[in-house]
């Protein structure tokens, strides 16, 4: 059963309204190839390899977190590859970061930041709140293992009871 790009966009906007995006962010429908959608590929970034994967898997739509268009385009750029292959693209960036239940709230849940009293900052792109007491060292190890992130500095035994995170 095919659906339209506009139907999918409507659903995504209900989850992460475009009004939540920062002024500079280019979110929403960035390429509309006009094709009915039977297959959707989701990704962090749209690259030439992702476009090839969409073609190989007969996907008519790619939904990405990071916008595929920020600057003037040239024929070799990914948006042209999307159009040439009849693939539409929807990007949900800072609006999905800021949306209730979006990227920042998900990170808070992973990090154990309490939902009660959780506050938004940085125009919705960050959250701050309390957490169960831990040490910087234990938190760094947890983040490295859970989020597959590197650790830059650890002063191991300082207590942590409040965390702030920014998804971008």
Where do the protein language model's features map onto the residues?
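Hydrophobic structural segments
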Residues: 1-168
């Amino acid at each position: 059963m095919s659906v339209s790009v506009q139907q999918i966009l409507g659903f995504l906007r209900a989850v992460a309204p475009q009004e939540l995006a920062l002024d500079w962010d280019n979110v929403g429908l960035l390429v509309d190839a006009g094709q009915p959608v039977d297959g959707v590929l989701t990704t962090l970034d749209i690259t030439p390899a992702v476009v090839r994967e969409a073609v190989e898997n007969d996907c008519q739509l790619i939904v990405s977190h990071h916008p595929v268009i920020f600057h003037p385009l040239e024929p070799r750029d990914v948006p042209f590859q999307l159009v040439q292959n009849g693939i539409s693209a929807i990007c949900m960036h800072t609006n999905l970061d800021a949306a209730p239940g979006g990227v920042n709230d998900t990170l808070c849940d992973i990090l154990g930041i309490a939902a009660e009293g959780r506050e938004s900052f940085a125009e919705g792109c960050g959250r701050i709140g309390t957490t169960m007491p831990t040490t910087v060292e234990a938190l760094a190890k947890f983040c490295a293992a859970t989020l597959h992130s590197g650790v830059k500095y650890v002063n191991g035994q300082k207590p942590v009871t409040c965390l702030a995170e920014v998804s971008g």
